[in-house]
From Swiss-Prot:
<dbReference type="InterPro" id="IPR011990">
    <property type="entry name" value="TPR-like_helical_dom_sf"/>
</dbReference>
<dbReference type="GO" id="GO:0005739">
    <property type="term" value="C:mitochondrion"/>
</dbReference>
<feature type="repeat" description="PPR 2">
    <location>
        <begin position="298"/>
        <end position="333"/>
    </location>
</feature>
<feature type="repeat" description="PPR 3">
    <location>
        <begin position="336"/>
        <end position="370"/>
    </location>
</feature>
<dbReference type="InterPro" id="IPR002885">
    <property type="entry name" value="Pentatricopeptide_rpt"/>
</dbReference>
<comment type="function">
    <text>Regulates mitochondrial small subunit maturation by controlling 15S rRNA 5'-end processing. Localizes to the 5' precursor of the 15S rRNA in a position that is subsequently occupied by mS47 in the mature yeast mtSSU. Uses structure and sequence-specific RNA recognition, binding to a single-stranded region of the precursor and specifically recognizing bases -6 to -1. The exchange of Ccm1 for mS47 is coupled to the irreversible removal of precursor rRNA that is accompanied by conformational changes of the mitoribosomal proteins uS5m and mS26.</text>
</comment>
<keyword id="KW-0677">Repeat</keyword>
<keyword id="KW-0507">mRNA processing</keyword>
<feature type="repeat" description="PPR 1">
    <location>
        <begin position="263"/>
        <end position="297"/>
    </location>
</feature>
<dbReference type="GO" id="GO:0003729">
    <property type="term" value="F:mRNA binding"/>
</dbReference>
<dbReference type="Pfam" id="PF01535">
    <property type="entry name" value="PPR"/>
</dbReference>
<dbReference type="GO" id="GO:0008380">
    <property type="term" value="P:RNA splicing"/>
</dbReference>
<feature type="repeat" description="PPR 4">
    <location>
        <begin position="371"/>
        <end position="406"/>
    </location>
</feature>
<comment type="subunit">
    <text>Binds to mitochondrial small subunit 15S rRNA.</text>
</comment>
<keyword id="KW-0508">mRNA splicing</keyword>
<comment type="similarity">
    <text>Belongs to the CCM1 family.</text>
</comment>
<keyword id="KW-0809">Transit peptide</keyword>
Length: 750
């Protein structure tokens, strides 16, 4: 029915609501392409680090002001001291002048005693007794009864650094041994013996005690056990010997007359010994025994267990739990400098420098003492973050500000900081300083090759970034002084110190880097064979992968590594002649490389591959990087085929399951990046899709592939990557789905 304007008003008013009205303007939809969508602004993860860095700068500024005030106060005090010294000196000069003006006796006549020169009344000086003094005075504090019995034998203890206790005990036995000596004096003498000598001379002490009819007390046995525990590690034979001594202690009744019960000190020594042996099960048994006997765990026990978790078993989670327990117990159990040092090292080793810096702030708030190990650990952790890279050297220079003498370990990590930063000139100078000081180690050798691999030599101006140490004036002065004083000329007096550096402070071309690294490796094979291990060979390969040609890398790859086929079932493989010919042409070096040391070729030929290291996942990852850099698909295919054989070997199969999964994921990620660099995006995507539910893929591993696909306009790849990452967040990270959230809201009712 049509309702026109002529219809009655009442009828129109009655029927009008029945018919809805529509807006004649249609809605407009705007479609945005996937690659044009505005990304959500990422939350800045560096805010906390920036805030901490600002607070740290303010703290250092306050410390500088305090130092200036302290220096001003010292200057005023020095001024007063100098004024006092001048007044005293003037008084002395006046007194000396008066003495000079006195007349001599010859001027006053013989037999007359000049007035004022009479001898003052004082005690008579005792005559010198040569028998009471001796040049053979013992430098070791010994009881008087022991010294009297030793007599002239104390000449073997003249210096604290040079003591011959074996001869001293022989002389003591000839003079009557321990007969008639108090047991307290005997214990004091045993405590005075250095631990590195006590472990050898303790059988003589036991013999002397037996001759005197005295029993070996538990305190002496505990001291002997301490001497046996010198060093960072203990092998099974040493543990068995210590357990034999503890078994003797169990046979003697304790204070309560019970057999089998040990003292708290013995239990603590046992825990420390098992920790150095990395035997966590035995440590737990001893701790459980202490609890059953009602012995409360002391801070020493917690410290030993924490140290074992950090340095031996690398169990970071357990270390954190122990540290938190000590903080919860507080009082005498509260963590001190040693415990903070261990937990900071653990956090740094697990790439959590942020938490390590929080603990550093706790130490500042609690006014705890610091040491070099803490400063070195914090410097090492800061170098792993781009935002804190310049802060790393601040912690190193704090060692000098505190007046500490840098240890060899500190110098090694200064070399590491320079290597990580790509400062090859400083790294070579620091390595030479360690070399001249006879403080080289396999770790320092690996750090030097890290410097060669990460060097800024050959980089463009756009890629170059200033060294972290040059940001500080103190750092610039330190670097300049080191480079000016270093002498890189090989010495002929000591072959071990004749490191074959090129005669220049800074290397300028990749060819120079390759040549020098080759010569340094040849020198190590000749005089420091123990330096050539898996870590150093891996970094040696990385130098060629980053700086050299593919032929340079393959030469080192084949010469220094091999595939360990132990446990692999041999299978017969047929290869087409055409493929074999093309592969051999691509992989075989055509002629000797000018960047390879001739001596290295002679050394490797003479030692007949005795230095070769078995290949592992890291070796294959470096090989993939070399193949990707030179766009060589055939070599990359050879690498991942051989890695499949390596997975069947006993060396890989014997690894823990979690470690195998981690290594497989690293290699899969390396394959994706390698294929991405070769512009084979479909192949890279195929690997990603086939392992989607096997590994936890994140943007960290897929950002390179995503950027390459977006640049090429390959929407299929970008869409698939977003889907894989989204599903990984749900499957591995516990992220709730949208439909599950809707269902949850509906069931909850709000």
């Amino acid at each position: 029915m049509f309702i026109g304007k002529k219809a009655p008003a009442a009828l129109r008013k009655q029927l009008w609501p029945v018919f809805p009205t529509y807006n004649i303007l249609g809605s407009r939809n705007i479609y945005v392409m996937s690659h044009e969508r505005r990304k959500k602004a990422a939350k800045r993860k560096s805010d906390k680090l920036q805030q901490w860095a600002e607070q740290e700068e303010m703290r250092l500024a306050r410390e500088k002001n305090q130092q200036y005030a302290k220096k001003l106060k010292e200057l005023k005090q020095l001024t007063r001291s100098v004024a006092s010294y001048v007044r005293t000196r003037e008084a002395r000069e006046l007194e000396a002048q008066k003495i000079q003006e006195l007349s001599l006796p010859s001027e006053l006549g013989k037999g007359s005693e000049p007035a004022g020169l009479a001898a003052p009344r004082s005690a008579k000086i005792a005559p010198f007794d040569a028998s009471a003094a001796s040049l053979s005075t013992s430098a070791v504090p010994l009881p008087q009864s022991i010294q009297d019995r030793l007599g002239l034998a104390v000449k073997y203890l003249v210096s604290k650094d040079h003591q011959n206790w074996s001869i001293v005990l022989q002389q003591l036995e000839a003079a009557g041994g321990f007969d008639g000596l108090p047991q307290k004096d005997i214990r004091k003498m045993v405590y005075a013996i250095p631990k590195d000598q006590l472990r050898h001379v303790f059988p003589q002490i036991e013999s002397l005690l037996g001759q005197a009819g005295l029993a070996v007390s538990p305190k002496l046995l505990n001291t002997y056990i301490k001497s046996l525990m010198l060093g960072r590690t203990l092998n099974d034979a040493q543990i068995a010997y210590i357990e034999g001594i503890v078994a003797k202690l169990r046979q003697e009744p304790g204070k309560e007359g019970k057999l089998g019960k040990l003292s708290r000190a013995t239990y603590e020594l046992l825990i420390e010994a098992y920790g150095k042996n990395t035997n966590v099960a035995k440590m737990n048994e001893v701790i459980q025994e202490m609890k059953e006997l009602g012995l409360q765990l002391s801070p020493v026990v917690y410290t030993n267990v924490l140290s074992t978790c950090v340095y031996k078993t690398r169990d970071h989670q357990q270390a954190v739990k122990l540290f938190d327990s000590m903080k919860f117990l507080a009082g005498s159990m509260a963590p001190q400098t040693r415990e903070y040092q261990d937990i900071i090292v653990s956090y740094v080793n697990n790439d959590d420098i942020e938490k390590a810096l929080d603990l550093y702030q706790e130490m500042l708030d609690q006014k705890l003492d610091f040491n070099q190990n803490i400063m070195v650990a914090l410097a090492r952790g800061c170098m792993s973050r781009e935002q804190l890279r310049f802060k790393a050297w601040d912690f190193i220079f704090e060692i000098y500000r505190c007046g500490w003498e840098p240890t060899a370990n500190t110098l090694e990590y200064m070399l590491y900081l320079a290597s990580k930063d790509g400062d090859l000139a400083l790294a070579r100078a620091l390595y030479q300083q360690l070399n001249i000081s006879n403080a080289l180690s396999p770790r320092a050798f690996s750090f030097l090759f890290l410097a060669y691999a990460r060097s800024n030599v050959g980089k463009s101006i756009e890629e170059f970034q200033p060294f972290a140490i040059t940001v500080h004036e103190e750092g610039r002065n330190f670097r300049r002084n080191i480079l000016e004083k270093v002498d890189l000329t090989p010495t002929t007096e000591n072959p071990k110190q004749a490191v074959p550096y090129l005669p220049k402070i800074s290397l300028s071309t990749p060819q120079e880097v390759l040549a020098e690294s080759s010569a340094v490796m040849a020198h190590a094979l000749m005089v420091n064979r123990e330096f050539v291990n898996v870590e150093s060979v891996t970094t040696f390969l990385n130098v060629a992968a980053r700086m050299g040609s593919l032929d340079d890398f393959i030469d080192r790859y084949e010469e220094f590594t091999f595939l360990d086929k132990t446990g692999v079932t041999e299978t017969k493989t047929v290869i087409e002649p055409e493929i074999l010919e093309s592969t051999s042409v691509l992989l075989a070096p055509k002629e000797p490389s000018p960047t390879k040391s001739p001596i290295l070729a002679q050394v490797t030929e003479s030692q007949k591959s005795a230095f070769k290291m078995p290949r592992n996942t890291i070796t294959y990852l470096i090989a993939l990087k070399a193949a990707a850099k030179h766009k060589n698909y055939i070599f990359a295919q050879k690498v991942w085929t051989e890695r499949g054989t390596y997975r069947k070997s006993a060396g890989f199969r014997n690894l823990p399951k979690s470690e195998k999964e981690k290594l497989d994921f690293s290699f899969a990620s390396g394959m994706v990046n390698c294929l991405t660099d070769m512009k084979l995006l479909d192949d890279a995507l195929a690997i990603l899709v086939s392992t989607e539910y096997q590994f936890k893929w994140t943007w960290k591993e897929l950002s390179h592939l995503y950027a390459a696909a977006a640049e090429a306009g390959y929407d299929k790849v970008t869409k698939t990557i977003r889907g894989v990452v989204k599903r990984a967040q749900i499957n591995f990270e516990g992220k709730i789905r949208r439909k599950d959230y809707k269902k949850y809201v509906m069931e909850r009712g709000y």
